[in-house]
């Protein structure tokens, strides 16, 4: 049982790590492309900078929320796992 709990916990931690890394990478790319497009739009039409800035900020907030959701899922995988208490006991030596 202890070995299975440890394997499950390692899988959860690995999945959480890869998940947040992929989410951060994707969000970074998306935000960079959005900022690039907004800067080009303001350069082409400076009079519309207010509307472009507001739209860009709303879009960036939406993109950032995706990364926050990935962080929440990663934290749930790590801390709300049913095997967390067992693995914590193993690591602190209380399991023996």
Curated annotation (Swiss-Prot):
It is found in: Cell inner membrane. GO terms for cellular component: plasma membrane; proton-transporting ATP synthase complex; proton-transporting two-sector ATPase complex, proton-transporting domain. PROSITE patterns: ATPASE_C. GO terms for molecular function: lipid binding; proton-transporting ATP synthase activity, rotational mechanism. It comes from the Bacteria. Keywords: ATP synthesis, Cell inner membrane, Cell membrane, CF(0), Hydrogen ion transport, Ion transport, Lipid-binding, Membrane, Transmembrane, Transmembrane helix, Transport. It is a multi-pass membrane protein. It holds the Pfam family ATP-synt_C. F(1)F(0) ATP synthase produces ATP from ADP in the presence of a proton or sodium gradient. F-type ATPases consist of two structural domains, F(1) containing the extramembraneous catalytic core and F(0) containing the membrane proton channel, linked together by a central stalk and a peripheral stalk. During catalysis, ATP synthesis in the catalytic domain of F(1) is coupled via a rotary mechanism of the central stalk subunits to proton translocation. NCBIfam families: ATP_synt_c. Belongs to the ATPase C chain family. This is ATP synthase subunit c. It comes from Desulfosudis oleivorans (strain DSM 6200 / JCM 39069 / Hxd3). The lineage of its organism: Bacteria, Pseudomonadati, Thermodesulfobacteriota, Desulfobacteria, Desulfobacterales.
């Amino acid at each position: 049982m202890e070995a299975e709990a440890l394997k499950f916990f390692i899988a959860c931690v690995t999945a959480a790590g890869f998940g947040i890394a992929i989410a951060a990478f994707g969000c970074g790319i998306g935000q960079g492309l959005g900022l690039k497009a907004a800067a080009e739009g303001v350069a082409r039409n400076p009079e519309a900078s207010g509307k472009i800035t507001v739209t860009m900020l709303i879009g960036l907030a939406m993109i950032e929320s995706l990364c926050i959701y990935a962080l929440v899922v990663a934290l749930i995988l790590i801390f709300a796992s049913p095997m967390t208490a067992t693995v914590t006991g193993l690591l602190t030596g209380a399991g023996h």
